[in-house]
Design a protein with these regions (language model features):
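Beta-strand-rich domain onsets/edges
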Residues: 1-15
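Short, ordered, surface-exposed loop/turn motifs in non-cytosolic proteins
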Residues: 15-28
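Glycine-centered tight beta-turn/hairpin loop motif at sheet-sheet or coil-to-beta transitions
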Residues: 29-33
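Feature responds to low-complexity, polar/acidic, surface-exposed segments characteristic
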Residues: 35-72, 79-106, 115, 119-135, ...
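Membrane-interfacial amphipathic helices and adjacent loop/beta segments
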Residues: 180
Length: 262
């Protein structure tokens, strides 16, 4: 990795001799790509992908991984992710009668409304301070994913005992399960109407966006990362997923792993 945040690739034959004019292409799970050809020294320098933090802690220094998340907080996450991928400023006006333009979440909700990521209620409210449920969050994640990928809902089934085929989010849950984003419970249920926790949120989002924490880098560089007073070590099951989500970093993404380079 150079000081300009570029990834260096060197090719050689079995005898260690440099190989020039080798075409190389890198592509991560977000479909960011870079390609080029090695020079006379067998070297090609390509940029690494930037993963921006999309979730933050609280003013008291905590993250509160097992707390629930509000619908407004969920909207903020997806707005940040879309803004990052599209290179747009987060702004927009919503038509929900309970979303004041003076609230911190107004632009986030307005921005997502433009892309059809969020749904309100029949009385034109959004209920920003209500907890977002597991099913609601999964549905939002699938809609977000469909902005950048060909999502074929309705092509999959799911066997959670509490998710009937006529459940409003059945096709979303089935798609997310097929994509590998979800874990249910040991008793075979999904509990879609339960409030989702902040730890569960980052786990789903990381999987849906192809972000995989580099545990080795994190362990060696804890002093450089954002710290939370209630997450001082890796004893919490979502420690690494939270580190991935809450720290902006450069990374080279492989099929089932990610190498942080800054």
């Amino acid at each position: 990795m150079t000081n300009d945040n570029y990834y260096t690739i060197k090719t050689s034959d079995s005898k260690g001799n440099a190989k020039a004019d080798i075409s190389i292409a890198l592509k991560d799970k977000k479909n960011n790509s870079a390609n080029g050809t090695t020079d006379k020294n067998g070297i090609l320098i390509l940029p690494a992908s930037e993963h921006k933090a999309y979730i933050f802690g609280y003013a008291d220094g905590t993250f509160r991984p097992d707390n629930n998340m509000s619908r407004a907080e969920a909207a903020a996450i997806f707005a940040r992710l879309i803004s990052e991928q599209k290179g747009e400023k987060i702004s927009g006006k919503s038509n929900f009668n309970d979303v004041s333009k003076n609230e911190w979440y107004s632009d986030y909700i307005g921005y997502l409304s433009k892309y059809g990521i969020i749904k309100g209620y029949s009385n034109s409210t959004f209920r920003p301070d209500d907890n977002v449920s597991r099913a609601e969050f999964v549905a939002m994640t699938v809609r977000f994913n469909s902005l950048f990928n060909d999502v074929k809902k309705g092509s999959y089934t799911v066997k959670y005992t509490d998710v009937a085929t006529n459940y409003w989010a059945y096709s979303d849950v089935a798609y997310a399960k097929h994509a590998g984003w979800l874990n249910g419970y040991a008793d075979g249920t999904f509990k879609g109407d339960n409030a989702i926790t902040r730890a569960e949120v980052v786990t789903v989002v990381n999987k849906a966006t192809g972000r995989i924490a580099d545990e080795g880098y994190i362990n060696k560089n804890l002093s450089l990362l954002n710290k939370f007073t209630d997450l001082k070590n890796n004893l919490h099951w979502a420690f690494y997923a939270i580190a991935e989500a809450s720290n902006t970093h450069l990374a080279n993404t492989h099929d089932n792993s990610e190498t942080w380079v800054k």
